[in-house]
Amino acid sequence: ICQASTTLYGGAIRAGMTIIERNNHTIASTYVPRGLDAMVSYGDSDLKFRNDLGFPVTIKTYTVGNTLYVEFYGQDPGWFDFIEPVSWASGHSAWAQRKYYKNGSVIRTENLPSSYYYN
């Protein structure tokens, strides 16, 4: 289930969604850089995000073989071309940001929730 929540989190980051709640795994995942995972646990931890872009967004999920895809569809917001998530780690801690680009230049950098891992 956590690979699905991590994939959805990555899509939400890249689509410009406002992250409301996100929890990392206690042990760092091998399938995503530290700081970019999302763990869910029924009754305890959840992944929540909100669309503040000012227009509706449709989320499409599907699988091809063993690969899960999450796609966000909506209007072009106009003020950015794409979003790149970046992360870095030191010891047990990890930090992440998303960088908004317009015409090849970073126009905005936003901190994402930090993480702490036991490994």
Each predicted region: which residue ranges?
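Well-ordered beta-sheet/strand-loop patches within structured domains
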Residues: 1-119
